Amino acid sequence: MKQKLFFIAVAAMGIASCSQDESTGINNGNAIDFRAALGTRAVETTTANLDKIVVTAIDKNDANYFTDAEFTKNDAFFTSTPAYYWPGDGSDLSFYAYSPAASDLGATVTINSTTKTLVDFSPKANIQEQKDFVTANATGNKTNETAGVALTFEHRLSQIEIKAKNGNEGYVYKVTGVRIGQPVSKGTFDFGTSGWTLTQDKTNYLAEYDQAITLGADAQGLMGDGGNAMLLPQQLVAWTPDTDMPNANKGAYLAVKVNITTKDGARIYPVTSVGEYDWVAVAIDTDWQPGQKYVYTLDFSTGAGKVDPEKPTPSDPTDPFKPGEDIQGSPIKFTVTVTDWTDGGAQDITM
C-alpha cells in the first residue's frame, strides 16, 4: 500500500475504533494521509520536530469516521496504523487535528458533530513541564489521495520569555528563578472556533535553577533549561502595589528570585534571616494573544522593583522588606559646597 506523511510534532494518543456509515462506502485506494506545516511564531513545536498528531474525522452524515487516531510522521507524510481509507463516494471528511495528546495536556478532548472542545486545560505550574498546544482543521476527499491533506497547525497558547540586564556597575544582581504571577490558569478551547473560554482561576508559574545567573549590561534569558512559558491567551489585569501591596486582588506580575549586593559586597537584598535569595516583582498588564511570543526584559540598572507581593509580612525586626514596598530608595545624590579659603596669616622665617 502506498503511504504518505506530513510535517508536525505531536504527542502519542491511542487509536480509537473507526465508525463508518454504510451509505458512505469505502475506497480501497490510497490510505488517508496528511502533509503538515506549522505557523512560525512560537518555537517549541515546529514543522521539523513534529512527529505525531492526533486526528478526528467527521463524515458527511455527521458521524465520527475515526476518533483520536494517531498519525505518525513517515518521510513526507503522516500516516496511521491501522490505515483509514477515503469514502468511495467522493464525499468530504472534516478533520480536526491537534498535538500533543490529551493525556499530555492533562485535559479532556471531545470532538464530534455537536461538541469540539478541550475542557479545563491548565498549563503545568512548573514552566519546565509545559507543552506547546497546536491545532489544525481541514476538509478533504479522495482527490487528496496522492498529495495528502495539507494541515497548517497554529499555536493556541501565548509564549512568554523573561530576560534581565543590569547596567549599573555599582551593584551585583544574581538570579536563580522567575515567576509569572497570577494569570488566569484554566480554560476550554473550541476546535471549531479556535477560541478560548477562560475561568476565574489564577495561579503562579515558576522556573528555578541552582546555577545563578549574574546580570550584565546585555539582556540575558532567565527561563532556565526547560524553555519559555506556554500560557493561556488573556488580557492581564495588573497588580496595583500602590493600593494593594499584598495583592489580595491577584493582579498579574513578574517576579525574579535575586541576591543583590553592592560591588564591594555590602548586602542589599534579602536580609540574611530570609536566605541567600528572595523575590522582587513588577506589575504587568499585557494582552496576550494566541500564537504570539512576548519577551519581557527587566532592567535593573535604575532600580530593583518591589518586594514580592506574596511574601508574608516579616516578623523579624531585622527584615525591613514588606510586601509591595520598593526594594531600593531613590538614587544616592549629594549637594556639594566648597568653603572659601580663609587667610591663615603670613610668616617671615629666618634660615
Mark where each language-model region is.
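Hydrophilic extracytoplasmic domains
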Residues: 262, 270-351
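Short aromatic-acidic-glycine turn motif
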Residues: 182-194
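Extended serine/threonine-enriched, polar tracts that run as long, contiguous segments within proteins
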Residues: 214-285
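C-terminal motif of bacterial Sec signal peptides marking the signal peptidase cleavage site
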Residues: 14-17
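Short, low-hydrophobicity acidic/polar segments
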Residues: 20-185, 200-201, 205-224, 231, ...
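Sec-dependent N-terminal signal peptides
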Residues: 7-10
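Positively charged n-region of N-terminal signal peptides that target proteins for export
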Residues: 1-4
